[in-house]
Amino acid sequence: MASIQNLYETVVGVLGDQASKVISALGEITVECLPEHYISVMTALRDHEELHFELLVDLCGVDYSTYKNEVWQGKRFAVVSQLLSVKNNQRIRVRVWVSDDDFPVVESVVPVYNSADWYEREAFDLYGIMFNNHPDLRRILTDYGFVGHPFRKDFPISGYVEMRYDEEQKRVIYQPVTIEPREITPRIVREENYGGQ
């Protein structure tokens, strides 16, 4: 635990006002920052001689709109990165809150960490978070014609469109979802002596 406390103090000293919040909980350090400080925070964590977080091992988008099963009062979207220092055998989490809920945009960290390339594409594809100055920001998991972003909390379970093969046109076509809602009533079977009576 002493190393976590030392890491916490070093991070607070190095980042200063660039970090909105530095949290030490459950044996992990989380740095929260605003979008305008994102690149400088990531660069400082990588380049500072005492920190040396040279690897970005994960980056993902998060939709907090129904966090803890209630209406979320803060910003809706965040980009969360996990960094690793091989030299110091330490990990740190960086969370940047995206300022606009309707059109989420944050700066790309690909110039700082090359490994962020496909992670940022995945966050764009699944959450609709745009990354400024990304070298190749396009969908990576869904179809190019896919409508919406499926990991957003307001995305319908059935989606917006479905695709099927049309025999007449001899090709795959897209059409609006044709799911018919139905009511399912459970069948109740009563047995004699059920419940020991």
Curated annotation (Swiss-Prot):
Query: Chief location of this protein?
Result: membrane
Q: Which reaction does it catalyse?
A: a quinone + NADH + 5 H(+)(in) = a quinol + NAD(+) + 4 H(+)(out)
Q: Name one Pfam family in it.
A: Complex1_30kDa
The protein's GO terms of the molecular function aspect are:
NADH dehydrogenase (ubiquinone) activity; NADH:ubiquinone reductase (non-electrogenic) activity; quinone binding
* Known EC number: 7.1.1.-
Q: Which PROSITE patterns match?
A: COMPLEX1_30K
Offer a single GO CC term for the protein. Answer: plasma membrane
The record's InterPro entries line, in alphabetical order, gives: NADH_DH_suC, NADH_quin_OxRdtase_su_C/D-like, NADH_UbQ_OxRdtase_30kDa_su, NADH_UbQ_OxRdtase_CS
Protein name (database record): NADH-quinone oxidoreductase subunit C
Look up and give the organism this protein is from. Neisseria meningitidis serogroup C (strain 053442)
Its organism's taxonomic lineage begins at: Bacteria, Pseudomonadati, Pseudomonadota, Betaproteobacteria, Neisseriales
